A protein has these predicted regions:
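Extracellular loop and loop/strand-boundary signature of outer-membrane beta-barrel proteins
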Residues: 1-2, 10, 54-59, 104-113, ...
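Membrane-embedded beta-barrel scaffold of Gram-negative outer-membrane proteins
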Residues: 2-67, 74-76, 88, 92-98, ...
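Surface-exposed coil/turn segments at beta-strand junctions on protein surfaces, enriched
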Residues: 4, 18, 76-78, 116, ...
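Short, basic/aromatic-rich helical patch in the C-terminal catalytic core of site-specific tyrosine
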Residues: 13, 71, 167-169
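Gram-negative outer-membrane beta-barrel transporters
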Residues: 31-33, 57-152
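Glycine-rich loops and low-complexity Gly/Arg-rich segments
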Residues: 39-40, 50-54, 83, 97-98, ...
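Short, low-complexity, polar/charged sequence segments that are solvent-exposed and flexible
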Residues: 44-49, 103-105, 158-162, 198-200
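Conserved C-terminal beta-signal and adjacent last beta-strands/turns
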Residues: 111-200
């Protein structure tokens, strides 16, 4: 069976404010509505070529809406130093679920939509040495947070929230060639944000 096309609309408004010459802020509000959304309904066992498979049943279940806001602040207190931070809030809910044999609609309606975190945060800083023996050397450090995400429609299974930290070093040569190295997940944090499997 071919899925119906997913339909929806989105509204977003935002503003940028220059508090001082070195400090700026951005704020945005959004609302998203989607119809004919697809959702993993259940896992179902199957056998193919004598091999047992655990497949996901995917179907169109109804409507979801998402609303929230994002705030970003950028600060450059001195030359060649830039810092920024941001926070995002998203309230994404499942609405108007269609009846199906794989899940209870009354247990899923109004629940947080799968794989969308409610809270996110990031902070970033970068500095480049402008004079002396280390002129051209740059360093940047960032950290980010993602709230827990649910793996299913009725919010009975989830991935934990986590923090990640990244570090970067760079050096700019006289010929404007930049060399750099980045270390992602600096503290070797174990985390999960998605689960993949066979679909049916």
């Amino acid at each position: 069976e071919v899925f119906k096309p997913e339909k929806g609309f989105q509204v977003e408004v935002g503003a940028r404010y220059e508090i001082t010459r070195t400090l700026q802020a951005n704020v945005s509000l959004f609302y998203i509505n989607k119809d004919n959304i697809r959702q993993t309904l259940a896992n179902k066992g199957d056998i193919a070529n004598g091999v047992e498979l655990d497949k996901k049943v995917v179907g169109q279940v109804g409507r979801m809406d998402s609303k929230g806001f994002d705030i970003d602040i950028t600060w450059s207190p001195i030359y060649n130093l830039s810092m920024s931070a941001g926070y995002g809030y998203t309230d994404a809910k499942v609405r108007d679920l269609a009846n199906n044999p794989y899940m209870q609609t009354n247990a899923s309606e109004g629940k947080q939509y799968a794989y969308i975190p409610k809270n996110t945060f990031y902070a970033f800083g970068a500095y480049t040495v402008s004079k002396g023996m280390l002129k051209g050397l740059g360093v940047n450090l960032s950290t980010s947070f993602q709230d827990k995400v649910y793996r299913n429609s009725d919010n009975t299974s989830s991935f934990d929230a986590y923090w990640l930290t990244d570090l970067g070093l760079s050096y700019t040569l006289k010929s404007n060639v930049r060399l750099g190295v980045n270390v992602n997940n600096l503290f070797n944090k174990e985390y999960c944000n998605q689960a993949l499997g066979n679909q049916l």
